[in-house]
Amino acid sequence: MRFWLALVLFVGGLTAGSIGVVNQVENTPIDTIIASQQLDQPTTYVMIPNKLLTAYSASPQITVRGGEIFIATARQSDLVSWLEGSPYVELRLSIDIARETAELAEVLVSGNGNLVAPEGSDLWITEVAGRSRVSLDIEPDNQTAILLASNGLELAPRSISIERDISDKPA
């Protein structure tokens, strides 16, 4: 009888332990949020607005892939004025809570303005240029927005990724 009691308790302990491990694994908090997009809209300029940059408390890292790449940070009002009249794509954050995914959505802003090279404008707080792959860590404030382009005449880079490491942020 003692043997059967010990066996039942042992199997019950194993079952409770496995349920606890599975529950812990399923409910582990997310430490990284990655929103990426292959652009569908053909455009020369892409704007990442301040609202997207400040959606979470962690500082985002922007990674852009494709040909010639130019990334600039500026006050959003300055960036919108610089783009005024030119067609561009504004990125928005689309979150699917059920699937636990974050994607970038494109909003096309039409215009007939002139296309100009963005390099060297006095409106830019920071600017980075490169080829194939460029990354930029952003410290967002309540005004910063980002411009992505190539040389101002060619299409903007097509692959954009915004990554945030939230593992060390308090809940």
Regions from the PLM with identified roles:
Residues 28-163:
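Extracytoplasmic/periplasmic regions of membrane proteins
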Residues 164-168:
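Beta-strand elements of well-folded, non-transmembrane domains
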Residues 1-29, 169-171:
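Hydrophobic secretory-pathway targeting helix
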